[in-house]
From Swiss-Prot:
Subcellular location per the Swiss-Prot or TrEMBL entry: Cell membrane
The organism of origin for this protein: Haemophilus influenzae (strain ATCC 51907 / DSM 11121 / KW20 / Rd)
GO BP, one annotated term: transmembrane transport
Family: Belongs to the autoinducer-2 exporter (AI-2E) (TC 2.A.86) family.
Primary subcellular site in the record, as a coarse category: membrane
Domain of life: Bacteria
Keyword Transmembrane attached: yes
Record GO cellular component, one term: plasma membrane
Entry's transmembrane regions: 7-27, 28-48, 60-80, 139-159, 196-216, 223-243, 245-265, 267-287, 296-316
Protein name per UniProt: Putative transport protein HI_0338
Keywords: Cell membrane, Membrane, Transmembrane, Transmembrane helix, Transport
Membrane topology listed for this record: Multi-pass membrane protein
């Protein structure tokens, strides 16, 4: 009888999770801007706290942040919409340029008596760089579509920041089973917030370093759309493991096609070097053991949240999974499931 009851509860829990995920998937147009606003508010909360500690009135700190966030969003939307439109119009020429570059390479190799033949027809049939460029355009326009309603998005962030001092206590009261558990739940919420703030803060710094490095490199090499590629590198660097690779491929392809092999290979080496230094030296040193997620879980979370919430889900995959792991750790009944998400180092 007890086994049947446990099985019934398990099946009921699985069904509830499936229904919730289906609801989130259907309501993605509402959920995605809300999540984006929530994480922006979480990132900005230490700034508000630092300003109020320096005796800046709370209302003035929020007003200044409102102006700053609005300017950043207007810049991003304006940049992506204007540059991406021009970039999209230039995509058809990439196939022709590829044929020219391969012809140049064939002539160079034949000059040194190296056998290499590849006809224009073969190139036209099997290689299409516009596929990569169209993907980049879709990603940019997708993100732009999410943040295009700047005013509403910023207002939600500001209201969240205004409610932040009391929101933690309210939420703790909702999830507490008894009044005596409120303080304990507040500590659990603090753990979630500190983990997410720490990760997003460090990731923002390293993403900014990557974006600035890419911009300086492309400007020095006179590669077209340098500001667009720098912005793309900044945004996609939030995607763990593969984000920097996704950002690097179209940059290298465009540099090879528009600027020639010399500059193209130079850009490839430069972009790889920037990502190696930031991703393998600076970020691990700053991050330390803060992440607490296994590599497999990071990759699977990227696929799952990307499927559920699109591009923004990929950007927020790690903080969402970190929040889930910490939330599972906070309850004795679910702590064992948190072990599945943790790094092997946590259990040594």
């Amino acid at each position: 009888m007890q086994n049947n009851l446990n099985l019934h509860r398990t099946l009921l829990g699985i069904a509830a999770v499936i229904i919730i995920l289906a609801g989130v998937k259907l309501a993605a147009e509402i959920v995605v801007p809300f999540l984006l606003s929530l994480f922006i508010a979480i990132i900005c909360s230490p700034i508000i706290k630092a300003m109020t500690q320096r005796r800046v009135p709370h209302w003035l700190a929020i007003t200044l942040l409102f102006v700053l966030i609005s300017l950043v969003f207007f810049f991003l939307v304006g940049l992506i919409n204007s540059t991406a439109r021009e970039f999209t119009q230039s995509i058809p020429q990439y196939k022709v340029l590829l044929s020219q570059r391969v012809s140049d390479l064939t002539g160079l190799l034949q000059r040194f008596n190296l056998p290499f033949t590849l006809s224009r027809e073969t190139i036209q049939e099997n290689f299409d760089p516009s596929i990569i460029m169209n993907f980049v355009s879709r990603v940019l326009l997708n993100f732009s579509g999410v943040v295009s309603n700047v005013f509403v998005l910023v207002l939600v962030v500001i209201f969240m920041l205004a409610e932040a001092p009391t929101m933690k206590h309210k939420f703790a009261m909702v999830i507490s089973s008894t009044p005596h558990d409120v303080a304990k739940e507040e500590r659990h919420i603090d753990r979630v917030l500190q983990g997410v703030i720490g990760y997003l803060g460090i990731k923002s710094i390293t993403s900014l370093l990557t974006g600035v490095g890419v911009f300086i490199l492309l400007e020095a090499c006179r590669v077209q759309y340098a500001i667009l590629w720098a912005t793309l590198s900044f945004l996609l660097n939030y995607i763990p493991n593969i984000g920097s690779i996704i950002a690097a491929i179209p940059i290298i392809v465009q540099a090879l096609l528009l600027n020639g092999f010399g500059i193209g290979f130079g850009v490839a080496i430069g972009v790889i070097a920037i990502n190696m230094v930031v991703g393998n030296i600076i970020e691990p040193k700053m991050m330390g053991q803060r992440l607490g997620l296994s590599t497999l879980v990071v990759f699977l979370s990227l696929l799952f949240w990307g499927w559920l919430l699109g591009t923004v889900g990929m950007l927020l995959s790690v903080p969402l999974t970190m929040a889930l792991k910490i939330a599972l750790e906070s309850s004795p009944n679910t702590a064992k499931y948190a072990c599945l998400l943790g790094d092997v180092e946590d259990f040594k």
